[in-house]
């Protein structure tokens, strides 16, 4: 690799910054609360920065970060269980601006989708969030979740069917 090739490769920090919106969405889908999602993002980013040497340049940083975030979420959930705390779903309010009826309707639809996503079992919600929301390939999502591709596919099918039922659409 010559000097020009090295300079054209995005830095770890640059790639990480570009991933922040996607990481935040994934954290929200895992934690079901905006405040917990922020805490989860911060903890996962801290772990990633501390483990930066373990990431191999040229590999998918998004898959690596999703795995770190998921493992951090699992650790947090276990710690809360041990402390006899329970997760209380916080209303994930969305702000609606303007008087436009379509904007108001979009806000209502968004809340319905958020409510339906939060009602899914964790395994289905993770699969749906990674594949349908974040756009990961099935193979990459299966690697992040550390499950066989067939298991991912069945969780997606069940998750989609449950969402369609909850949202009143024909399966």
Predicted segments with their positions:
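A short, charge-rich alpha-helical start-of-domain segment used by transcription regulators
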Residues: 2-25, 35-38
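Sigma70-family region 2
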Residues: 5, 43-60, 79-80
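Acidic, proline/glycine-rich intrinsically disordered inter-domain spacer in sigma factors
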Residues: 10, 14, 91-118
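Short, aromatic/basic-enriched loop-to-helix "N-cap" motif that marks the start
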Residues: 21, 53-67, 149
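Structural recognition of an alpha-helix C-terminal capping motif at a helix-to-coil junction
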Residues: 39-46, 59-71
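Arg/Lys-rich amphipathic alpha helix in sigma70-family domain 2
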Residues: 56, 67-88, 105-106, 158
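A short pre-motif secondary-structure segment
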Residues: 127-131
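DNA-recognition helix of helix-turn-helix
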Residues: 145-169
């Amino acid at each position: 690799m010559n000097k020009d090739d090295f300079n054209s490769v995005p830095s770890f920090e640059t790639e990480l910054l570009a991933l922040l919106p996607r990481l935040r969405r994934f954290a929200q889908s895992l934690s079901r609360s905006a405040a917990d999602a922020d805490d989860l993002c911060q903890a996962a980013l801290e772990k990633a920065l501390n483990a930066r040497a373990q990431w191999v340049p040229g590999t998918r940083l998004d898959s690596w970060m999703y795995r770190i975030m998921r493992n951090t979420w699992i650790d947090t959930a276990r710690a809360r269980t041990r402390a006899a705390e329970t997760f209380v779903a916080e209303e994930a309010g969305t702000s609606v601006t303007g008087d436009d009826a379509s904007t108001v309707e979009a806000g209502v639809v968004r809340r319905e989708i958020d409510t339906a996503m939060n009602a899914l079992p964790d395994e289905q919600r993770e699969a749906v969030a990674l594949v349908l929301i974040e756009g990961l390939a099935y193979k990459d999502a299966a690697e992040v979740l550390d499950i066989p591709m067939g298991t991912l596919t069945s969780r997606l099918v069940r998750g989609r069917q449950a969402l369609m039922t909850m949202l009143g659409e024909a399966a």
